[in-house]
């Protein structure tokens, strides 16, 4: 089994040089994604796992929205053409908006070997069972755990996520693989993403991952 794991594309506009109306950082992102497609052509993976944050911003103007959606759709369609199965999972809501993913899912609806995942669940493929744990939604969590302090929220949410890791593992029959868009304590943050987002940062404890005994853990979020 061969897996192409990717995440945190952040398709969108960034602060940086603009030449002839083209944002060069955004252009570089697209070039990197096109290079990834070339790798897929050469490697022919069985499964492509995209672990969240396809887009950079949830709320953008109509022109950018169209351009970014076309870019995402084209890249995913190309990956689907050169692999056997593609799983695209939603990341954090401030990047991967609910409306964006509804449109993305609709755009990819007729591509039979693509699954767009917005809720926790297990995707069963001929090669492995992929447990998917998309990014958090603050309001959804607070509805489940009302009236807690910030510290209590983090503890409750982290326990909830850990429980989901075990519950999804129990649904796996073939080779179990976890896709998740959360921080794992102890991860390498040398790229500059050095804060644990102290206001709100539920994590997956390493102990939970070890105990759940997934064959592979394919993360997004910290980069």
Q: Positions of the model-derived regions?
A:
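Active-site metal-binding loops of divalent metal-dependent hydrolases
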Residues: 7-9, 15, 53-54, 92-94, ...
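Receiver (REC) domain switch-region micro-motif
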Residues: 48, 176-178, 217
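Conserved catalytic scaffold of divalent metal-dependent phosphoesterases
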Residues: 100-203
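Extreme N-terminal starter segment of soluble prokaryotic enzymes
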Residues: 1-4
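Core catalytic region of metal-dependent phosphoesterases/phosphodiesterases
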Residues: 21-123, 206-214, 222
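Conserved protein kinase catalytic core
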Residues: 11-14, 59, 97, 140, ...
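Glycine-rich N-terminal loop/short-helix segment of MobA-like nucleotidyltransferase
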Residues: 13-22
